[in-house]
């Protein structure tokens, strides 16, 4: 079932060789919803119906991973149903795509942000945690937030699980979405979101600018102002960039 039509939820997924788990929490009602593909339980239809009903999702590194896997599932739903795939066959396909997505991360994505099933807010990207100097995991964030529990996965994600281990996995995933929710509601995050909303409205930035880091917002605004002043096309200006393997500081500083 779906919680309601066109709502926004905070979510996380777990992918193992023989199990797919999706947990989401409604940002308004705090109701948690669960979908599982494992053993005798196959929530594929309900999961896809739920994903198509969403107005937006909030996660941590969800642009590069969670939303990619969910889009893959949506794209293959009809084929799996037509071929009457059982849960083990579906999870095998999902696990394979999950590994491919992890291996291609930071190179290119299978599905661009504009082609995803709903809008995404990625707290990981917005706070620029994908920068080498600021890199932060959700577990590290839980510690920094003094969250009530900082849990490491009780299961090897490259393994298959048992029925008893599924309960542990659900508890682990639930802790992740609750800590993501706490970070979403943190004052620092609220300020960053309001800043981006204001800039997007004032300067007609695209909706996905909410996921831009502060430095990217600055560079995009400079490009916008420059193109408006020179009447140049932003795509053409980007092509004029000089590729450099190194910079001699003595040539830059007098």
Residue map of PLM features:
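A short acidic-Thr-Gly-centered motif at the start of a beta-strand
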Residues: 1-6, 49-51
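Conserved "right-hand" nucleotidyltransferase catalytic core of DNA-directed polymerases
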Residues: 2-3, 14, 136, 144-152, ...
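Two-metal-ion RNase H-like nuclease active-site motif
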Residues: 6-15, 120-122
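Short N-terminal binding/cap micro-motifs at the start of the first secondary-structure element
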Residues: 17-22
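A generic structural motif
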Residues: 23-27
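Conserved DEDDh/DEDDy metal-dependent 3′-5′ exonuclease domain
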Residues: 28-140
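Short beta-strands and strand-loop turn motifs
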Residues: 121, 153-154
């Amino acid at each position: 079932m779906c919680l309601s039509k066109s709502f926004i939820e905070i979510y996380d997924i777990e992918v193992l060789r023989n199990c797919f788990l999706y947990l989401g929490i409604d940002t308004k009602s705090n109701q948690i919803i669960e979908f599982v593909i494992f053993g005798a339980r196959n929530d594929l239809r309900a999961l896809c119906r739920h994903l198509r009903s969403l107005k937006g999702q909030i996660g941590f590194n969800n642009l590069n991973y969670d939303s990619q896997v969910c889009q893959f599932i949506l794209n293959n739903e009809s084929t799996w149903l037509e071929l009457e795939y059982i849960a083990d066959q579906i999870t095998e396909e999902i696990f394979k795509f999950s590994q491919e997505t992890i291996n291609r991360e930071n190179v290119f994505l299978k599905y661009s942000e504009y082609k995803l099933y709903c809008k995404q807010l990625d707290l990981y990207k917005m706070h620029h945690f994908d920068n080498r100097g600021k890199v932060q995991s959700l577990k590290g964030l839980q510690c920094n937030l003094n969250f009530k529990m900082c849990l490491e996965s009780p299961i090897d994600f490259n393994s298959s699980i048992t029925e008893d281990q599924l309960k542990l996995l659900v508890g682990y995933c639930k802790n992740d979405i609750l800590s993501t929710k706490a970070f979403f509601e943190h004052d620092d995050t609220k300020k960053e979101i309001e800043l981006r909303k204001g800039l997007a409205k004032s300067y007609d930035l695209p909706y996905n600018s909410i996921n831009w880091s502060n430095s990217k917002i600055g560079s995009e605004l400079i490009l916008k102002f420059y193109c408006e002043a020179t009447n140049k096309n932003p795509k053409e200006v980007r092509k004029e960039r000089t590729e450099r393997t190194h910079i001699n500081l003595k040539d830059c500083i007098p």
